[in-house]
Structure formats: structure tokens, C-alpha cells
Amino acid sequence: MKALTWMWTASRRAAWVAAAASVLLAASGDAFAADASAAAANGASAANPASSASPDIAPAERLLFMSTHLKGVQPQTELDYAVERTGPPAREKDTVKVLIVSSDNANGDALVSDHGGKVEVPGEGLPCNPVILYFLEHDIAEMEQLTGGQRRYFQRRVRLALAASPAITPVVLNAQGKKVTAKQIVIQPYLDDPNGARFSQYIGKRYTFVMSEAVPGQVLLIRTEVPGSNNDFAHPLQSETLSYQGALRSLSPLPGKQTPDKAVNAPRASR
């Protein structure tokens, strides 16, 4: 399945409204294509704050996609993340690993793997931790499967919500017994969606990103939650959480390299 682009240039952002109808209508039989023209004509709805985003890169986009999250991480370091999914059809757990190949990931060649083995993640030349793109790619693929909609449609909603300059809130979290300062971004990309009636169960879906320079890779936690009845997030219908677990220096060096240091003891994020 072809990966999508997660970062807009200024020209792409400015042209979205004009292009949205043709992009969505190109997929015959798409569940949301019938309303694509109306969404584009309304600038993705005046009620949606994401539609009024500046052509400039928003701080939230810069934090998630344009920051060098892997700076300072040595080659052959493995970053481990726990993934937990709750809700129908079943509760699932997984481990996602990011292996740093080049120092600071300068070559953009970090490798991502999960229970199924190596995962191709669209790098797009972005300096960010690829686990962010891994999580978002999985999320929109799941939305497509659950709703019968189009991946590109859901991806655009998430991008617009981040482009709307959502608040970046300072938070303090407990990571393996230590207080860690972090930055939190929360978005709900499907609120006021003109096509929301077609996937009403997911209108209130919430995305939370927690970033911290206190951990290697800077991704402390990413979570999505589909609220229960009456917008109840205390008892979500579905949730998926990716949380940082630690960093490990591999004992198998790259060809021509010396054996790296022993395991790096780093704080683990509490879920």
C-alpha cells in the first residue's frame, strides 16, 4: 500500500482546498467522495479551525515532523516502544523497535520493525523519529478498514488539525520513577467534519502526542482514543497507546565498527 505524505510544503497547504475534491472524487466508490466537493468549497468547513491554518509550518507540525528527535543517539542503538490496543475486536499488545543505523540518524536510515518484521515507513526526508510516522500510518489504515473510507481523507484531516496550531502544553510525567518534563499536543481532527455522519462513531476520536527531550528519540507517548457514549473518555470504546520503554545498544556492531557500549539505561514511560 502506497504511503502518504505527512508534511506539507506551503504551496501544498495553500492548494489543498482547491485539490481536495478532485483527489477524493478520483476514488470511485469511496464512501466520502459524494461530499468531497462541498467540503472543499467550504474550505473543509469554516467551523473546523484546521481549515484556517497559516501556510507557514505550525509549531505542532514542527515539533512532530521537523525536529531532529534522534540527534545524539548513537548508531546501533535500539529504541523500544510498547503498543497496546484495546477495544473490539480484541485487546492486543506489540513491541515496536527503531534501530538507529547512522549517528543522529543523519542519513535517514533508521529501521522500524514490529511483530511482523521490518516495516517500510515513509521517511519523506523528514528528520523526525520514524515511530511517529509508523503510528500514524497504522492509524489511518485502520480508519480506512473500519469505516470504508479513504486513507488519504483521514490523513488530510489529521494534517489539517496539526496545521491549525493546536496548543503545545507543558506537562510533567513519571518515567520509571523520575519526573520528566514534556510537551503535549492534543487534536480531534474529525470534529465538525462535513462527512462526519458517515463515521459518527469516530467523530470524537482524540489524538495525544507527548514529546520529551529527556528520553532518546524524544517520543514519550502517542495515544488515540475513541470515546464511549456521551463522549466518555474515561471509558473509551477503543484506544491505542505507543509508549517509550527504553534504549539498548546492540552488541552486534556495523561492519568496520568497534563493539558499542553496553545497554543504555534510560527512563521508561509509564502508561
Predicted regions and their residues:
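Intrinsic-disorder/low-complexity peptide segments enriched for small residues
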Residues: 2, 22-23, 61, 97
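Bacterial N-terminal signal peptides that target proteins for export
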Residues: 2-18
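Acidic/proline-rich low-complexity IDRs
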Residues: 3, 7, 23-24, 172
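Bacterial N-terminal signal peptides
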Residues: 16-27
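Sec/Tat signal peptide C-region and signal peptidase I cleavage site
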Residues: 29-33
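Acidic, serine/threonine-rich low-complexity disordered tracts
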Residues: 38-123, 149-271
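Surface-exposed, glycine/proline- and aromatic-rich loop segments on solvent-exposed faces
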Residues: 111-142
